[in-house]
Amino acid sequence: MNKLYIGNLNESVTPADLEKVFNDHKISFSGQFLVKSGYAFVDCPDEQWAMKAIETFSGKVELHGKQLEIEHSVPKKQRSRKIQIRNIPPQLRWEVLDGLLAQYGTVENCEQVNTDSETAVVNVTYTNREQTRQAIMKLNGHQLENHVLKVSYIPDEQSVQGPENGRRGGFGARGAPRQGSPVTAGAPVKQQPVDIPLRLLVPTQYVGAIIGKEGATIRNITKQTQSKIDVHRKENAGAAEKAISIHSTPEGCSAACKMILEIMQKEAKDTKTADEVPLKILAHNNFVGRLIGKEGRNLKKVEQDTETKITISSLQDLTLYNPERTITVKGSIENCCKAEQEIMKKVREAYENDVAAMSLQSHLIPGLNLAAVGLFPASSNAVPPPPSSVSGAAPYSSFMPPEQETVHVFIPAQAVGAIIGKKGQHIKQLSRFASASIKIAPPETPDSKVRMVVITGPPEAQFKAQGRIYGKLKEENFFGPKEEVKLETHIRVPASAAGRVIGKGGKTVNELQNLTAAEVVVPRDQTPDENEQVIVKIIGHFYASQMAQRKIRDILAQVKQQHQKGQSGQLQARRK
């Protein structure tokens, strides 16, 4: 995406005029300007320079009496499903943006683009061309919180080689390789290991000391700790603090962290700018609840064990542009480093659990995109994309409709209004987004403290709908800033299969709880309903609940399969 289209040009504009404008604004370009009648093309060295040119010039700079309009140059064949939305208010919440995008179709992917501008930029992929066309028509020029959105196509490489072009690919409709293809027939595909970086926030005045003369200090740190360190100097120009990302083993990250802390402490002492420099760790909000623990127990234990004082920034500071919380640790350098190890250990555990759940969802729900669901904002480096291939047979065949599931989710009674929205707008939008039926059951008693949300739809719809409900409750502050959203969910299982969910001596249900971190209860002495089904209760945070639900469905599928095999065997025996 390095090639730019420059529109709204005066007929008299020459390549030299454009070169001068780019040079005056210190925008790098490569090659010659190709000037046509009223428009031109030029290449930039990379995508970052292209974005900088768009932000600097488009609708802001005049040339020969006309305002330049600059966007990515996209060949007609590649104008398909991908668009870029610019000038998004930085404080805008994902929920609002997702709702706006969902009005024009199903969003497959929504990822944030790192830029130097104060406003946010996202790249969006819709399911088909028509949805994308509608989104451009309606969103370009749309006013949102005093910001006018700018929308344009970006290249969709898949459109050139995809089914819309009439070429047969080796992949099915959902992107999974066909069974028997070389990918699935051989050994399992190795997943690229994805590290979770240690991200620090450091005062801007100490960045120079950390880098050192001609980069000597930071080179020494990377060499000694076997790490890769990125100092994000250009982001948030003028900010009092800058982010540093450290990529290495946990031990390497901790060693680099200690060296950086020592450098900052020395610099503060030499310049007499501060008595102490606290350690500030950035962690994605998805992991912070589990770091804090129930009633703050995990965090208190870390404080006690390391003799430090730890505070975490407010949820109110989270925006579309900033999905991370700041964890501030105060104490001696030695103790701060011990706290860093404990904090990152908890964060990595939460990450691994979520990836396990995500991997499971990717296997059971091919094509599921978590960024589109809005649970893992794509700006987060902490979450890898779903596996590109799934070995073995798919749980349900691509030509068979996925099985409908009904799940009961219990929410605080006072949250019903937020889930329904004004004139029912939010629940309708949620239903469309997830492709699920979502209904709120009447209260069991006038003073009920919880209400039941009945969600009916296939696995992917369940994942999306439940994920949004968890997110909405957190966003609307129905749970405290240090409290993780944990909900009770009920699924019905055949009474004959309840024993398989429990296992001998409760072994299966105990393993299920250990694996998923959810509380799973099969109440004893239940009377089966008219369909000979009983309730299984699941209590936990979103990923724990999802993983438990999918594992239980997996057990039920095995029971059903064995039952069908048994019936088939009996039938064959009778024929003989």
Swiss-Prot record:
Keywords: Cell projection, Cytoplasm, mRNA transport, Nucleus, Phosphoprotein, Repeat, RNA-binding, Translation regulation, Transport. SUPFAM superfamilies: Eukaryotic type KH-domain (KH-domain type I), RNA-binding domain, RBD. The keyword Repeat applies. SMART domains: KH, RRM. Changing residue 213 to E: Decrease in Y RNA binding. Only small decrease in affinity for binding to ACTB and MYC transcripts, some accumulation in the nucleus, and complete loss of formation of higher ordered protein-RNA complexes. GO terms for biological process: CRD-mediated mRNA stabilization; mRNA transport; negative regulation of translation; nervous system development; positive regulation of neuron projection development. PROSITE patterns: KH_TYPE_1, RRM. The keyword rRNA-binding does not apply. Pfam families: KH_1, RRM_1. Residues 158-189 are annotated as: Disordered. Expressed in neurons and embryonic fibroblasts (at protein level). InterPro entries: IGF2BP1_RRM1, IGF2BP1_RRM2, KH_dom, KH_dom_type_1, KH_dom_type_1_sf, Nucleotide-bd_a/b_plait_sf, RBD_domain_sf, RRM_dom. It is found in: Nucleus; Cytoplasm; Cytoplasm, Perinuclear region; Cytoplasm, P-body. GO terms for molecular function: mRNA 3'-UTR binding; mRNA binding; N6-methyladenosine-containing RNA reader activity. One of its GO terms (cellular component) is cytoplasm. Residues 2-75, 81-156 form the RRM domain. Belongs to the RRM IMP/VICKZ family. Can form homooligomers and heterooligomers with IGF2BP1 and IGF2BP3 in an RNA-dependent manner. Associates with the cytoskeleton, predominantly with actin filament bundles and occasionally with microtubules. In a heterologous system, interacts with ELAVL1, DHX9 and HNRNPU. PANTHER family: KH DOMAIN CONTAINING RNA BINDING PROTEIN (PTHR10288). Domains KH3 and KH4 are the major RNA-binding modules, although KH1 and KH2 may also contribute to transcript binding. The contribution to RNA-binding of individual KH domains may be target-specific. KH1 and KH2, and possibly KH3 and KH4, promote the formation of higher ordered protein-RNA complexes, which may be essential for IGF2BP1 cytoplasmic retention. KH domains are required for RNA-dependent homo- and heterooligomerization and for localization to stress granules. KH3 and KH4 mediate association with the cytoskeleton. This is Insulin-like growth factor 2 mRNA-binding protein 1. The lineage of its organism: Eukaryota, Metazoa, Chordata, Craniata, Vertebrata. The gene is IGF2BP1.
